[in-house]
Amino acid sequence: MSAEDQLTDNLATFARFEPLTAAETAAVEQTAAFLHSRIKIGCTGCRYCMPCPMGVDIPDNFSIWNKLGMFGQPEAIKHQWEAHFPDAEKASHCVRCGKCEAACPQHLPIRNALARLQQELDQL
């Protein structure tokens, strides 16, 4: 916002604010639960865990793993994993040093997740 008319427009958005109905709230909660059930790991892609001393691209590994969980499509994921993901950046190069976990603002179990990810994608 850099002008008064923009501020007025933004405030008008909430002039007729109404909270969600019980049915709308239930629908949002149901959708959130469904999405949460498909996500493999709650990585936001902030990249605070980077750089990895071994060259593992942690957020990109988690992104492809989450795509598998969210959309399925194992053949497409396998192709992306094998053809477009540099081997040097794959989870298999993790030596479990823990530097990434110390930096993660989400406090994710990155080392264990990378091992599960590699095992799951190797089985595609």
How would you describe each model-predicted region?
Residues 1-124:
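Structured C-terminal cap/extension of enzyme domains
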